[in-house]
Amino acid sequence: MTKDNEEKTYSEVEFLTVDGLKLRGRLYLGEANGPALVMAHGFNAVKEIVIPWAAEVFQKNGISVLLFDPRNYGESEGMPRQEVDPEKQIEDYFDAVTFLRQQPGIDPEAIGLWGVSTSGATAIGAACFDKRVRLIISVCPLIEATFREEMVPDVMAQIIREREALVAARTAGQQSPQPTLVPMINQVGVSPMGFNAIHGKNFYEEMPWFKETAPNFRPHTTTLTYYKMLRWHPLSNIRCLSPTPIQMLIPGKDDVCPTQEQLDFFEALPGPKRMEYYEDRNHHGLLLGSAFEGVMEAQVRFVQDVLAGKFALKSGSQ
């Protein structure tokens, strides 16, 4: 394990993707030859923000964790920087599983995927294709990437203008033209690109804490990120998910990924499946605050139940 002033419970690792990028993360080793989870954060968020607390709980319960930054942001390679590419992030999950299966002390037949918000959906999307995956934990997943309808025509026009500018720069001889970056959220708590999953003045006010916690966090994305989000329908292949067990943790007052969309999606899943429902929690309230301990207990129990063959199709929690 690495030491830096205080003892850390993880080692720093890197692994290659199929297209040659180095993705970087943390490996929290749990029980020898035991189960493991691949974890990634949500939209443009880096691995240092909040979810290390969850990784440490899994580790203390014998579950190893590979927590990594997807391509294009954080400590991982990939260009353009700050371009969120959810389809490629699904592939990053594939390659993270390949890496984790090769690590000593990991049971290669007991690896699950974990995601929250945007990555909660990409984890499901990855598991639809990758049958090496033993289970999925999806925390308040973004079921559909929606935009403010009145802004969509302007967003589409900005996307095309950006492509024109990048082509013009390459025509003029630039090898790596710099893309236009836009803030994730403005001072009044609205995405300048009308992306519904990023909103709320509280979210804007938390940005300094994010940057203090993770100096490599950048509170902006490329314009073309939103082209990729407009085209993204991550859960169109859910018919392929079964028989991989999934646990969804759903807040009853989700102000980012509408609660009813999550509930409807859960009901449509072919199973096996388990739901934990938290009536009084919002999107950011499951991994922060007083609910955290119970939320983590439910996730640890799910992993243990799946591996022990005790998995029930559905349970509830408040």
From Swiss-Prot:
Pfam families: Hydrolase_4. It catalyses: aculene D + L-prolyl-[peptidyl-carrier protein] = aculene B + holo-[peptidyl-carrier protein]; aculene C + L-prolyl-[peptidyl-carrier protein] = aculene A + holo-[peptidyl-carrier protein]. Disruption phenotype: Abolishes the production of aculenes A and B and accumulates aculenes C and D. Disulfide bonds: none annotated. The keyword ATP-binding does not apply. GO terms for molecular function: hydrolase activity. The keyword Chaperone does not apply. Transmembrane segments: none annotated. Keywords: Hydrolase. It comes from the Eukaryota. It is an enzyme of class 3 (hydrolase). Pathway: Secondary metabolite biosynthesis. Gene3D superfamilies: 1.10.10.800, alpha/beta hydrolase. Its EC number is 3.1.-.-. Thiohydrolase; part of the gene cluster that mediates the biosynthesis of aculenes, a unique type of norsesquiterpenes that contain a nordaucane skeleton linked to an L-proline moiety and are of mixed biosynthetic origin. The pathway begins with the synthesis of dauca-4,7-diene by the terpene cyclase aneC using farnesyl pyrophosphate (FPP) as substrate. Belongs to the polyketide transferase af380 family. This is Thiohydrolase aneE. The gene is aneE.
